[in-house]
Amino acid sequence: MRYDSICEAFFIERPNRFIAHVLLDGDEVVCHVKNTGRCRELLVPGARVVLSRGANPLRKTAYDLISVYKGERLVNMDSQSPNAIAAEYLPRLFPDLTSFRQEVAWGDSRFDFCGVKGGRSFYLEVKGVTLEQADRTYFPDAPTERGAKHLRELTKLQQSGTDAYVLFVIQMQDVLSLEANRRTDPAFADALLAARAAGVGVYAVDCLVTPDSVTAQSTVPVLFL
């Protein structure tokens, strides 16, 4: 996926989940943060960030904060990008894919994708990953009851005979592994273990991130601890 009208700035502060103050060409500017997660390890004062100018001139904020440099590594933190990346990546993940749809309801949940591959129906949920420590990535970065619920629903699907998958889209490149962040959310970690034991397919892919694009790159090992 690609972004239009990008520029770089320096992060100043984040007064709430939705906006950040940045220094752009010497001026302090308020921008929209396209991720309501904490991202405290990324958004530190002075960090270089990438902004994308919004297309609507009537918006309250002219820019979206989409990526941030953590050292030399550029991390995409747009919470809407993982689904777009996954849509581009699905034909590579499933070579026998024949069709898919997005945002499909099942039971009390809504899954990111439903499709057909090899003549069988499947459901797939996508999780975006931005938390990295020593080249290892973790999900989630904050407790997510919704995430654990999705895994339980995927487990039910798999047990009922329908193929179910979860895809972790790691919004950076050159990482060693992905694992559930048990310290932050033990319920999610347990749900992931149970899903895998039931036969749910668990995949992770890292991404080539540039200032104006994000593209799925290489499969990453998922560690179950």
Q: What is each residue range found by the language model?
A:
Residues 9, 111-141, 154:
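Conserved catalytic cores of phosphodiester-cleaving nucleases, focusing on short active-site segments
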Residues 16-21:
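Short aromatic-glycine-enriched beta-strand elements
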Residues 27-41:
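Beta-strand/loop nucleic-acid-binding surfaces
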Residues 37-50, 155:
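Short nucleic-acid-contacting surface segments enriched for D/E, G, S/T with interspersed K/R
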Residues 44-56, 206-207:
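Flexible glycine-rich surface loops and low-complexity tracts that mediate binding to linear polymers
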Residues 93-106:
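A short acidic/basic microdomain associated with nuclease active sites
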Residues 135-145, 155-184, 206:
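Nucleic-acid nuclease catalytic cores
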Residues 171-225:
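Domain-level recognition of nuclease-like catalytic cores that cleave nucleotide substrates
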